[in-house]
From Swiss-Prot:
Assigned GO CC terms: cytosol
CDD domains: AdoMet_MTases (cd02440)
Gene3D superfamilies the record matches: Vaccinia Virus protein VP39 (3.40.50.150)
Xref: NCBIfam families: rsmG_gidB (TIGR00138)
Ribonucleoprotein as UniProt keyword: no
Name of the protein in question: Ribosomal RNA small subunit methyltransferase G
Biological role: Specifically methylates the N7 position of a guanine in 16S rRNA.
GO MF entries: rRNA (guanine-N7-)-methyltransferase activity
PANTHER family: S-ADENOSYL-L-METHIONINE-DEPENDENT METHYLTRANSFERASES SUPERFAMILY PROTEIN (PTHR31760:SF0)
Similarity comment: Belongs to the methyltransferase superfamily. RNA methyltransferase RsmG family.
Keywords: Cytoplasm, Methyltransferase, rRNA processing, S-adenosyl-L-methionine, Transferase
Broadest EC class assigned to this enzyme: transferase
Subcellular location per the Swiss-Prot or TrEMBL entry: Cytoplasm
């Protein structure tokens, strides 16, 4: 997917990029690849692959969660790595207020430099573990309209990292690939225990590559019990699974 095909694919979804936004994506790509030569940010570096598997893929939640397009949501992105999905969403929908949490400081350094390069405002980057960022005494607990995570762990684990950060009435949106149905089948306990309710599992394929993708939307319907998230590492070692 070259930049022109990227623009056309988004237009087909009712998203029209401005010339400024197209340039921001071009600059994002150049800076990502240049930085990646000395900091391991991504294994995907060819331009068509970055545009498809990072940029386009990151924007797919807006195909299913229309509030992303118009509302000034507070969005927290857990384990965003090189900024996916939240920074492509921020470029296209600048009214979003974006917070990124990542456990590796070198990624946070990259994100700060990238945000300056792209002239992004309304973004904040935190070097922290998600378990601590949304912990029972944390200022950010239940503080966000929307929390996103992209393929960083299976659904039962992601739910424990992300749902504590979502306001009651807000949503957790997970960007997943294959195996999502299997993960959801054993994640009901985690989702319910943490105050969530499965609202949608939207299955589709990426253009060009045809790779399977899922957008999983979980509504936050009640407060997360104080004992969650458990201490760093525990959600992964002892997941809340059915």
């Amino acid at each position: 997917m070259n930049p022109e095909e990227f623009r056309a694919a988004l237009a087909a979804q009712g998203i029209d990029l401005t010339a400024t936004q197209e340039q921001q994506f071009a600059d994002y790509y150049q800076f990502l690849v240049a930085t990646n030569e000395h900091v391991n940010l991504t294994t995907i570096t060819a331009e068509p692959d970055v545009y498809l598997k990072h940029f386009y893929d990151s924007l797919t939640p807006a195909f299913y969660v229309s509030a992303l397009r118009t509302e000034p949501l507070t969005l927290c992105d857990v384990g965003a790595g090189a900024g996916f999905p939240s920074l492509p969403l921020k470029i296209v929908f600048p009214q979003l207020q974006v917070t990124i949490v990542d456990s590796l400081n070198k990624r946070i350094t990259f994100l700060n430099e990238l945000a300056a390069k792209l002239n992004l405002t309304g973004v904040a980057f935190h070097h922290a573990r998600a378990e601590e960022f949304g912990g029972k005494r944390a200022a950010n607990r239940e503080g966000f309209d929307l929390v996103t995570a992209r393929a960083v762990a299976r659904m039962s684990v992601l739910s424990e990292l992300c749902l504590p950060l979502v306001k009651v009435g807000g949503q957790f949106v997970a960007l997943k690939a294959a195996q999502t149905e299997n993960e959801l089948a054993v994640s009901q306990k985690a989702i319910t225990t943490l105050g969530g309710k499965l609202q949608a599992d939207e299955a589709f394929n990426l253009p060009v590559s045809n790779d399977p993708r899922h957008i999983v939307v979980i509504d936050k319907v009640k407060t997360t019990p104080k004992r969650y998230p458990r201490k760093a590492g525990t959600p992964n070692k002892e997941p809340l699974e059915d």
